[in-house]
Amino acid sequence: MIRKINLEHILFLDIETVPEQENFNLLDDAKKELWEHKSKYQRKDGISAEEFYERAGIWAEFGKIITISVGYFNYTGNDRTFRVTSFYGEEPNILKEFKTLLDTHFNQPKHLLCGHNGKEFDFPYIARRMIVHQIELPEKLNLFGKKPWEIAHLDTMELWKFGDYKHYTSLKLMAHVLGIGSPKEDIDGSMVKEVFYKEKDLDRIIRYCELDVITTAQVFLRLRNDNLLEEEEIKRV
């Protein structure tokens, strides 16, 4: 079925998130209490809410988006390119620019969004943060009242599950199993908060995020049994 999808109709994406504040003590008292309540079932072995705040970026209610990277295929005759770009800066601006992209270029029923674990993380996270900032949801993220088959979302992790709802496979593992080579990653997801707040190296995070977009596209190609992208076909714009 996925072989019938026109690759030019898909927007591949990945987001990077961090806690809304650099540390727990910068939260107001109400937010501290809410975090303590929210995290108590995840915390183990006597870990305090303050210590566990390192992971707050996972939740849209306590985190924020620092970059959205996207990629899309373009065909000119027999020539194939995969263009990658990123939105970064203040979160409201990131979200507005991303919304403009969707509203302008990916607004038709034929268009699809694709991410790795996108249905459980990236897509709802973006939608929730848009609502927080009073940004009208673009059609591709507005799921209210839609039937499951009307939702234009693809998820490489879900495609790999083959109905096994318990199965979780990281993008890195999938790429390795499917024989997809990639440059050595400079960082991983657990390091993003420190690189953002301590090192203040957003460019490093953007490179990591863009690599995940490229890898997601490569995984999707393998799931279709298509040829993988060559380095010269990838254009960062």
Whereabouts are the PLM-identified features?
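Metal-dependent phosphoesterase core characteristic of DEDDh/y 3'-5' exonuclease domains
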Residues: R3-H9, G63-G89, F106-R207, L211-T215, ...
